[in-house]
């Protein structure tokens, strides 16, 4: 631009003074044009800087966030987080209710006159356990029972227990009376036991043994080295107005029953248990018919499964407070079982012999005389279900004669399971 302006000026050939003024004016004009060009060139850069400065606050964090998200934690930090999560998971939470169920379905057919063969629904049992603190726990057992016209719900056990240590545990509630072995080893839930039913002397709803007990119980181990001694001692309500039931709502007299059980589990002979029990109560049948009751029992058990050996003996003494008349009843059973080594050890044949005698002088019980042989087979369908089949040969004494008559043969089948 400067060269063009100068060429134009020199082509006009004005006077010298005028030429100097024109050159000065042209130079000033060129200087103004250069400033203008510089300003115009500076505007896009300023606009881009302004735009970048406006958008930078919102856009800048994105790469940082992405970088932080993609950046892995150090190994020791990850291990620390995992350890903390594991500790939180392992920490106990109270209360922590757990529920387990048992059920069974049965079939029976006998040659006893006046009875019908067919299926029946066994007990539906729920076990509920909850820790309330590191040393306090609660346990409940409820059953749903089928009857000809309806169902009944029974609270079989309801126990709150405080564990001071292994040598002393105290509890209150409704128990299975710790007499002998079977009554506290196998509770409601037929899957728990080898056979279909309990022995007659400890059957649910029976009268020979007080199955349930309402009151207080202390139990624990006894320091005895390898002998493995343990005890349980309880005080509570005895038999109720219906002697097959305890005094759930209160005792029917002012005399408390007590029970004591002592047994050993030698460490060197795992599966072996032997011991004895004693029970004392006052039975009130109404009308001034009160009786002192003494029960003593002993048991010898081997539970390794190959073989299984269960045996119990129980003696019941009743003395009339009014007349002093005494009656003595006896009962025992022996059960043998062997888990076969074939078919993944799922087959277990067993045999049980039962004997029960009540004298004619016995007025607390009805006639309970019994001699029974049971041949059975248990097949464990899975770890939580079993199929059982039994043949029973039963003889009961007829009241009019001193000999055992009333022989009954029967086939019994059951499928039982836990869930």
Q: What is each of the regions a protein language model found here?
A:
Residues 1-7:
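Bacterial N-terminal signal peptides
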Residues 10-104, 419:
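N-terminal periplasmic/intermembrane-space "pro-region" immediately following the signal or transit peptide
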Residues 203-206, 220, 246-250, 264, ...:
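Short helix-to-loop capping/linker segments positioned immediately adjacent to catalytic or ligand/cofactor-binding
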Residues 93, 118, 152, 208, ...:
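A generic structural micro-feature
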Residues 85-241, 254-259, 263-270, 333-339, ...:
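Outer membrane beta-barrel
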Residues 113, 158-163, 171-174, 190-191, ...:
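Outer-membrane beta-barrel pore domains
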Residues 20, 30-45, 127, 137-141, ...:
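A general secondary-structure boundary signal
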Residues 234-249, 281-283:
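Active-site-proximal beta-alpha loop/turn segments in soluble metabolic enzymes
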